């Protein structure tokens, strides 16, 4: 298991004010689970200054992304590789690194532009996801040419990026790695699962309460590097003090339903504690896939 932590400090901000860095409680971990031989998940927690100051990541060489300056945003990212062998892990790593380079360069100016430019910001996030897709496809083609063993469609990954630019959380995702928003006992799934099962639900061909049991529940309809890549973007108000952002790969949600996630978030003592509690539940129930969990909270005023 790989885990990283940035603990909150003294709490002094007023309700609804932008939290300081030392008020944020951030934690992320990843675990291979009990079945898979390799962990193909990657994650990242960082703050964007002019570039990125890495607080937590599973990426092997993040130093080139780092630089300091005034904080512009906070980033949470998860990527769940598919494709077998080392291809899935390479795909998730490439996607994560590519979108972060895009965020720390092309998107640097957006946080200062104001809410009137939200559509431009969301368009840029879509472009960042498509840039990651192009990078993974290029790597897959090079691998296929070099080895003759992999097709250009054999490397793929999910990708979910949440970028907190006060007072909004902007989310772009491809695949079924989820972003949740929790406040005052209410858990909302921000992202839409891009799976064949969810497509059937949307078309009215499958009841929503049967989607999790469907054989198509984890068959991706959209992925980075896959046959179809359709980034979706959304925006969430994060001014409520005590709200929690949770992100995870499907290694968690295969074993832990939303109701239990909400219960644990409602009783959470810290981001570290809740991530470990959810991981332990998934492992106790089989740990059939790689498991990655990230949590972020701006604590309530005391």
Q: Which residue stretches match the model-derived regions?
A:
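PP2C/PPM-type serine/threonine phosphatase catalytic domain
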Residues: 1-302
């Amino acid at each position: 298991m790989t885990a990283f932590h940035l603990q909150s400090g003294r709490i002094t901000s007023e309700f609804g004010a932008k939290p300081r860095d030392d008020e944020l409680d951030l934690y992320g971990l990843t675990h291979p689970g009990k079945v898979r031989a390799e962990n193909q998940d990657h994650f990242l927690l960082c703050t964007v200054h002019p570039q990125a100051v890495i607080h937590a990541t599973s990426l092997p060489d993040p130093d080139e992304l780092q630089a300091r300056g005034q904080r512009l945003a906070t980033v949470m990212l998860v990527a769940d590789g598919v494709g077998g062998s080392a291809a899935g892990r390479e795909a998730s790593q490439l996607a994560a690194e590519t979108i972060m380079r895009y965020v720390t360069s092309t998107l640097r100016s957006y946080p200062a532009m104001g809410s009137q430019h939200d559509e431009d910001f969301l368009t840029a996030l879509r472009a960042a996801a498509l840039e990651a897709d192009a990078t993974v496809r290029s790597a897959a083609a090079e691998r296929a040419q070099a080895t003759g063993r992999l097709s250009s469609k054999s490397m793929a990954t999910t990708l979910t990026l949440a970028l907190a630019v006060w007072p909004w959380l902007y989310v772009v995702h491809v695949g079924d790695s989820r972003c949740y928003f929790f406040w005052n006992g209410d858990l909302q799934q921000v992202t839409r699962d891009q799976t064949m099962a969810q497509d059937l639900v949307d078309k009215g061909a499958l009841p929503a309460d049967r989607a999790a049991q469907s054989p198509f529940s984890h068959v991706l309809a959209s992925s980075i590097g896959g046959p179809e890549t359709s980034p979706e973007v959304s925006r969430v108000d994060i001014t409520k003090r005590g709200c929690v952002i949770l992100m995870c790969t499907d290694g968690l949600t295969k074993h832990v339903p939303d109701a239990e996630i909400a219960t644990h978030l409602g009783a959470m003592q810290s981001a570290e504690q809740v991530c470990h509690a959810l991981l332990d539940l998934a492992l106790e129930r089989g740990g059939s896939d790689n498991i990655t969990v990230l949590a972020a909270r701006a604590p309530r005023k005391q």
